């Protein structure tokens, strides 16, 4: 079923042809899609944050001429090296968890037109999965960001 056909079916159920059960299904559909919209928005902001952290960390970790620990004691140099690399990996893995959250969901409707409990269950499963992915992306981004802040502090204080 095309997106246009889906929209027409939902509009008919909500406006004219729908029973109270149909209208409840449409309301559930709308609520679940609103949740996906919020996840998309939050994930977009998280990916922007990760882009900044990854770019900064990649510059500090990969570009040898910008080594802020060149004149540091071996312990500080090793600690900075480890924190920088771990933070970079955490931020990149965070992006890996975030990208599926903003993907397009296919196959919610089966061949039969209409909205039923199975369609709502499939959409609910998509929301649940993407919420789980976003939660992990957020945790990893926070860990990567904290690592970046620690790296900056080490480079500044040493």
Task: Give the residues covered by each predicted segment.
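Short membrane-interface loop/juxtamembrane segments of multi-pass integral membrane proteins
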Residues: 28-29, 35, 113-134
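Serine/threonine-rich low-complexity intrinsically disordered regions
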Residues: 2, 19, 44, 73-74, ...
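Alpha-helical transmembrane segments and their immediate juxtamembrane boundary regions
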Residues: 27-30, 34-107, 135-158
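Short, charged cytosolic
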Residues: 3-28, 110-118
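Phosphate-binding glycine-rich loops and adjacent basic patches that engage nucleotide phosphates
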Residues: 1-3, 16-18, 85-93
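Short, compositionally biased low-complexity segments
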Residues: 2-11, 95-103
């Amino acid at each position: 079923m095309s997106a246009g056909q889906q929209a027409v079916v939902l509009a008919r159920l909500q406006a004219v042809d729908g029973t109270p059960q149909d209208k409840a299904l449409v309301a559930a559909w709308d609520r679940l899609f609103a949740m996906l919209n919020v996840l998309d928005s939050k994930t977009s902001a998280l990916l922007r944050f990760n882009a900044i952290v990854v770019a900064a960390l990649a510059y500090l970790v990969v570009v040898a001429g910008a080594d802020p620990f060149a004149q540091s004691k071996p312990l500080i140099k090793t600690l900075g090296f480890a924190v920088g690399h771990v933070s970079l990996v955490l931020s990149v893995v965070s992006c890996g968890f975030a990208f599926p959250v903003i993907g397009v969901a296919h196959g919610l409707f089966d061949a039969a037109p209409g909205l039923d409990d199975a369609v709502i269950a499939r959409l609910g499963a998509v929301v649940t999965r993407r919420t789980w992915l976003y939660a992990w992306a957020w945790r990893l981004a926070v860990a990567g960001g904290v690592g970046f802040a620690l790296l900056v502090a080490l480079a500044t204080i040493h």
